Amino acid sequence: MADIKTKDGEMNTYIFHPERNGPHPIVIFYMDAPGVREELCNMCRRIASAGYYVMLPNMFYRRTRAFDFEPRRAHDPAYAGRLQEMWLNVRSLSPDLVAEDTRAMLALASEDPAAGKGKIGVVGHCMSGRYAFAMAGRFPDRVGAAARFYGARYIAPEEKDSPHLAAKQIKGEMYFGFAQFDEYASDAMIEELRVFLKENNVKAEIEMYPQAHHGFAFPGRAAHHVASAERHWERLFDMWRRNL
């Protein structure tokens, strides 16, 4: 783990990569709202084992060095305080802040001989899907592939730094994977995104995952759907092979 210095403090970031045959293309894995946990570390290890230099930052470092929420207890009254804390953490973030953090991660990686110097991949699930989208536009010369799964609020006109505002700068390939059943991603929202991407000539694919629910890719979730999770991995690795 590395403590990456930013203007707001130290961002504790887990780094995974193969021991041999570097340098390896960089993939930034932006966490979801429950925070950095072993489940995400294992997903990053899977990516690293395929030949990538993976960075998993604690995006809530401005508020806490460690936050781990158990999604299965989200409706437990005894867990209400923890749930409230999670939403406070989520609301503390913005595309501008995540861009600052991404810049700091890339600066650190530039000094690591194990990290590649070319195009990078970014991936976000749920909360961080919008940040993966935003970073593709903020760092168009670095992000070769950006993927998001069951995210929301990609187009938020009321926000001065909404993810969609930098879409015209995107040069890399985009992928959006949505669950068939997801209260956070309505059909209308997905269609609005589809039209927006086409109108702005963004190279993107939007795919629906039948029978899947929000959170399907996470093995520790009740919503885990094996077939959809494996398809999600197939799409990620295929896109990275083409672009990184």
Label for each model-derived stretch:
Residues M1-L244:
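N-terminal cap/leader regions of alpha/beta-hydrolase-fold enzymes
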